[in-house]
Amino acid sequence: MTKKLHIKTWGCQMNEYDSSKMADLLDATHGYQLTDVAEEADVLLLNTCSIREKAQEKVFHQLGRWRLLKEKNPDLIIGVGGCVASQEGEHIRQRAHYVDIIFGPQTSHRLPEMINSVRGDRSPVVDISFPEIEKFDRLPEPRAEGPTAFVSIMEGCNKYCTYCVVPYTRGEEVSRPSDDILFEIAQLAAQGVREVNLLGQNVNAWRGENYDGTTGTFADLLRLVAAIDGIDRIRFTTSHPIEFTDDIIEVYRDTPELVSFLHLPVQSGSDRVLNLMGRTHTALEYKAIIRKLRAARPDIQISSDFIVGFPGETTDDFEKTMKLIADVNFDMSYSFIFSARPGTPAADMVDDVPEEEKKQRLYILQERINQQAMAWSRRMLGTTQRILVEGTSRKNIMELSGRTENNRVVNFEGTPEMIGKFVDVEITDVYPNSLRGKVVRTEDEMGLRVAETPESVIARTRKENELGVGFYQP
């Protein structure tokens, strides 16, 4: 009888990536097959996130539901992982004694051993340690699920922003060696992946070891990824302004595989608030990066993160944030009301901004961003955009859906053989969360991948000088 695994995931793209790797790992070691139905599962895993307010209570609420399943099936294994587990492991054990496994973001690769241990002596297992590189050494073989894929290149963060739990829950920065990253991406490309999204809590701080023992830079890595046959688009998430060096900007100038869209969190437009947040950069320095980026790639669009109502934020501070939003002309944002995360320095600050004021500021900020995003979308009306077709549309299963380079979802009429390929689409309609278009050119008509024989290359490139001596001219 097939054993089944159910994973519930909350939070960031890194958590989504971790969950997919857990599923692949437990399939390889124990033969567990994923199921969307918790009642069918032999193992239940909750991959948690501590960024949102009341994250801990959300975890216990979910565990309470699963407790009922365990009462019906005592052999059921329940595991809690992710950032809440790392932060609140002992509390979870005390309050939810029926949980069998508690693991942190850096120990998910040890799940097979943990499950074996629980199956053996029924004793609970808690492992929320921070082994430096071991997790990367034990990743399962990559498995493509469509034309796009996430690839983790580093973990953790050394920035210690005063509001953020990441350094405490995921540890300090650890970079994967470049060879491991490139091999994983090459394997994915061989399975039909056309776009990769490089992941890290502070991805542009990557400093991985190269094959010759030297330390590479993120700019080096981007160029190496772009050289992999089959990879046509590169994205990365999430960056820190302080690590956004000029050599990365130069990659935007000369590497077309790197998309014209960047998510670069700023959090506030007030230098005073940025200092309280421990961001180590000013609003002017942030704008200087954007100015250089647009000089290198004029059509690039920028999204960002904002926290409103941070302790001590005045009306003037908020107005400076709104000015920055207008100056940069952000295309999109993830914006939140400040809520203290236990164990962070900001949790000890006086939360002196009234709740209603926070809500009002968030509304104003989001309305402005939405207006700017719609203006960007309207500029695309009537233009031809290259779409990577990801699958059927969520709105209409008789239509296809894909993304533009600037991360817009486009729905259009097409045929199944277009999935996984590029099409050029004329944008005909603009909506708040998507675009609509009609196909004007398929990938077969683009000449993107023209197979050539060695003889044809020689015939095309062979030249002779005036003495009749042959040479090659690429």
UniProtKB/Swiss-Prot annotation:
Residue positions binding [4Fe-4S] cluster 2: C157, C161, C164
Recorded GO CC terms: cytosol
Subcellular locations according to the entry: Cytoplasm
Every TRAM domain range: 378-441
Coiled-coil positions: none
Catalytic reactions on record: N(6)-dimethylallyladenosine(37) in tRNA + (sulfur carrier)-SH + AH2 + 2 S-adenosyl-L-methionine = 2-methylsulfanyl-N(6)-dimethylallyladenosine(37) in tRNA + (sulfur carrier)-H + 5'-deoxyadenosine + L-methionine + A + S-adenosyl-L-homocysteine + 2 H(+)
InterPro entries referenced in this protein's UniProt entry, alphabetically: Elp3/MiaA/NifB-like_rSAM, Methylthiotransferase, Methylthiotransferase_CS, Methylthiotransferase_N, Methylthiotransferase_N_sf, MiaB_methiolase, rSAM, rSAM_horseshoe
Domain Radical SAM core: 143-375
Record NCBIfam families: miaB-methiolase, MiaB/RimO family radical SAM methylthiotransferase
Cited function: Catalyzes the methylthiolation of N6-(dimethylallyl)adenosine (i(6)A), leading to the formation of 2-methylthio-N6-(dimethylallyl)adenosine (ms(2)i(6)A) at position 37 in tRNAs that read codons beginning with uridine.
UniProt protein name: tRNA-2-methylthio-N(6)-dimethylallyladenosine synthase
Organism per entry: Salmonella paratyphi A (strain AKU_12601)
Gene name as annotated: miaB
